[in-house]
Amino acid sequence: MSQSTFVLRRNGFTFKQFFVAHDRCAMKVGTDGILLGAWAPVAGVKRCLDIGAGSGLLALMLAQRTDDSVMIDAVELESEAAAQAQENINQSPWAERINVHTADIQQWITQQTVRFDLIISNPPYYQQGVECSTPQREQARYTTTLDHPSLLTCAAECITEEGFFCVVLPEQIGNGFTELALSMGWHLRLRTDVAENEARLPHRVLLAFSPQAGECFSDRLVIRGPDQNYSEAYTALTQAFYLFM
């Protein structure tokens, strides 16, 4: 499908090589997901897992960034979101490489015999309390259906020894998530703190954990420069995806 066809569509987000419809998904395409999909380390991976796939954004971004031999499994609990993810993937250049599963990850993982070099998730992080407009959005935003200990346990059960488990979270929640992960035997290997501009404190954090101990590399990413245009670093990270960058 051509870029001109993508541009005419209004029910989702247009990227350079694919289109993500998200009108039937509780959580829409946003900066968090784009950051995570562009940032996660893909060198040498053979098999990837997207937990809580939503519209299929992360699976599609990983497919664009990896070799044609890399297979990707995308697991999504909510049936309507999973159906839309499948439609998005069917219309992409990588339909043969991405498998969508409508399933509870905690049940699905027990049936798997393969392990994954890269596991990626843009997980829910709100606790119950703030009212949501729909049950689907509540499921996407709250940790009630998949809390963080369960998410870390699922990832641990199917990751390779040298693999990476990558998430994006609000800064403070990410700090707590890191403490929890370390207490469960994970090792933090990559951390990028994300700020809107140089004057602001980081509001998001990108984290990569591994079962294997090693040096932790950390840095800071600023999204916008003094002129309010995208910074050089953010442009370098995401320009393979944004249509007009």
UniProtKB/Swiss-Prot annotation:
It is found in: Cytoplasm. Specifically methylates the adenine in position 37 of tRNA(1)(Val) (anticodon cmo5UAC). It comes from the Bacteria. HAMAP family: tRNA_methyltr_YfiC. One of its GO terms (biological process) is tRNA processing. This is tRNA1(Val) (adenine(37)-N6)-methyltransferase. It holds the Pfam family MTS. Coiled coil: none annotated. GO terms for molecular function: nucleic acid binding; tRNA (adenine-N6)-methyltransferase activity. Keywords: Cytoplasm, Methyltransferase, S-adenosyl-L-methionine, Transferase, tRNA processing. It comes from Escherichia coli O7:K1 (strain IAI39 / ExPEC). Gene3D superfamilies: Vaccinia Virus protein VP39. InterPro entries: DNA_methylase_N6_adenine_CS, SAM-dependent_MTases_sf, Small_mtfrase_dom, tRNA_Adenine-N(6)_MTase, tRNA_adenine-N6_MeTrfase. Belongs to the methyltransferase superfamily. tRNA (adenine-N(6)-)-methyltransferase family. It catalyses: adenosine(37) in tRNA1(Val) + S-adenosyl-L-methionine = N(6)-methyladenosine(37) in tRNA1(Val) + S-adenosyl-L-homocysteine + H(+). One of its GO terms (cellular component) is cytoplasm. CDD domains: AdoMet_MTases. Its EC number is 2.1.1.223.
